[in-house]
Swiss-Prot record:
It holds the Pfam family Pox_polyA_pol. It comes from Rabbit fibroma virus (strain Kasza). Its EC number is 2.7.7.19. This is Poly(A) polymerase catalytic subunit. Belongs to the poxviridae poly(A) polymerase catalytic subunit family. Polymerase that creates the 3'-poly(A) tail of mRNA's. The lineage of its organism: Viruses, Varidnaviria, Bamfordvirae, Nucleocytoviricota, Pokkesviricetes. GO terms for biological process: mRNA processing. The active site is at residues 192, 194. Heterodimer of a large (catalytic) subunit and a small (regulatory) subunit. It catalyses: RNA(n) + ATP = RNA(n)-3'-adenine ribonucleotide + diphosphate. The gene is PAPL.
Length: 470
């Protein structure tokens, strides 16, 4: 045994390391040095300040917080499983290396905020949005309750923290969804704050520790296999606290953004395209049937933004929108005619199975596919005059051989997402797609083509049980 490392392990474990502990943990000696040298008093002070600023309603004393922190940093002393020791070291290392910069900094005075004057009045456009959603309100409500509807009572506290976090870390964290629309239009109601960031796992682990230390309760971090780079934080009752998608820095750079009150939001034109896509998912249409007013305000806000930004005249002239698709049910591929627009491709093959797209891209021997991760939920490839892509939602049919207009709009929006993220001009097709929302009749759904079935195991980070699975 190396005497210096053995002494370090003795200091950390509070006991002489066994032979197996020594050999398994000796390569962790640098991380262990960081943990031992970490100033717990300063850390406890930061936790208390975070509690005072964002969780003041939580009934836990300063003494209890200190006990909780010190207890976790000595947890290894009563742990003899090598696997659990590895987990404790990994989580403690994340905490001592990142917490101050990620969440501790939120207790300091921030930069001056310059309130945005960008606010949108939706009175004139709300009737158009109402009519559009009335035509799309064709789903039969099921009794299934989606997990996203089980909300933790901690959400309001975390939202307050997230507002500050988005301002301090606006180079690597942006928001989208209802909160971003609330910044444009205070009529929009929001629940949790939806975010994209480049260090999602680190942030959520730090937040999990903060919640653990100031509430005394365990929270669990889950990685969902069928959503790309998605993690969700849940409380002890399995209620949703916050989720986050992780994206690469290069993806972050190509996303068009709008700065409002020192917070970057995903450009509402891109969000409108995502909303078009969302309506092709049958359970989202059930949400529409349950609460049409909530979605009406959101759709109207997005429509008003793009109307103003792109100078769109709302007259119902939709030209080639939505672009029509023809479904091959056996191959689960849709052939969409895009020739009506000046794109760099004449048609688009929309795959309903991601593995089939990946296989065909390999067969094409093409190496210039672009993947915008969960921003588009698909890779895109142009080969010849064809755009190849994958569509992750259900496809609705209005009769046995005809794709429903809702899904045609969704696929058209998916194609425009590619145009937006690659910096191409979208003014005319966007204008046409928005105008295609007008003067529609309600058409019932004949059949739902199921979405791609993803397989895989949930990953988990459980601080209390010392578990990390990938």
């Amino acid at each position: 045994m190396n005497a210096r490392i053995a002494d370090l392990l003795y200091n950390y474990l509070g006991r002489p390391p066994s032979l197996s502990e020594y050999h398994m943990l000796k390569l962790q000696h640098r991380n262990i040095q960081k943990i031992i040298a970490f100033n717990k008093d300063i850390f406890i002070s930061l936790i208390k300040k975070n509690k005072k600023k964002f969780f003041s309603d939580i009934d836990l004393t300063s003494s209890e917080i200190k006990t909780s922190v010190l207890s976790y940093f000595s947890k290894q002393r009563d742990t003899y499983s090598i696997g659990k020791l590895y987990t404790i070291i990994e989580l403690q290392t994340i905490l001592v290396s990142t917490y101050t910069d990620v969440l501790g900094v939120l207790t300091l005075k921030g930069p001056d905020m310059f309130p945005s004057s960008t606010r949108y009045d939706i009175k004139s456009i709300k009737q158009i949005a109402t009519s559009a959603l009335h035509a799309m309100n064709v789903a039969v409500i099921s009794d299934k309750v989606m997990g996203r509807h089980n909300v933790s009572p901690l959400v309001s506290n975390v939202n307050a923290l997230m507002e500050e976090y988005l301002r301090r870390h606006n180079k690597n964290c942006i928001c989208y969804g209802s909160y971003s629309l609330y910044l444009l239009n205070p009529e929009v109601k929001y629940g949790d704050i939806d975010i994209l960031q480049t260090n999602s796992r680190t942030f959520l682990i730090d937040l999990a520790f903060l919640i653990k230390f100031i509430t005394g309760s365990n929270v669990v971090l889950l990685k969902v296999p069928y959503l790309k780079n998605y993690m969700v934080l849940k409380d002890k009752d399995d209620n949703h606290i916050i989720d986050s998608f992780n994206i690469r820095q290069e993806t972050m750079q190509v996303i068009p953004k709008v700065l409002i009150d020192n917070i970057y939001i995903v450009d509402p034109a891109l969000q409108l395209m995502s909303m078009f896509k969302m309506f092709s998912q049958i359970d989202r249409l059930e949400d529409l049937a349950r609460n049409p007013e909530k979605l009406t305000v959101r759709l109207a806000t997005l429509m008003e933004y793009v109307r103003v930004k792109y100078g769109i005249i709302l007259n119902g002239e939709s030209n080639h929108m939505p672009m029509k698709g023809v479904l091959d049910k056996d191959k689960r591929i849709i052939d969409v005619d895009t020739s009506g627009y000046n794109f760099s491709f004449k048609k688009c093959y929309v795959y309903l199975d991601e593995s089939s797209l990946s296989s065909d891209i390999l067969d094409l021997n093409a190496d210039d596919a672009v993947d915008f991760e969960n921003v588009s939920n698909s890779a895109y490839l142009i080969n010849g005059d064809v755009l190849y892509t994958y569509f992750s939602n259900t496809i609705l049919l209005s009769d046995p051989d005809t794709i429903h207009e809702i899904s045609n709009k969704a696929m058209s929006a998916h194609i425009l997402i590619y145009q937006i993220l690659t910096g191409n001009d979208i003014r005319q097709p966007l204008s046409d797609l928005v105008n295609s929302l007008m003067y529609n009749e309600k058409v019932l759904i004949h059949e739902v083509i199921p979405r791609d079935k993803k397989t895989g195991k949930h990953g988990i980070v459980d601080i209390e049980k010392d578990i990390i699975t990938h």
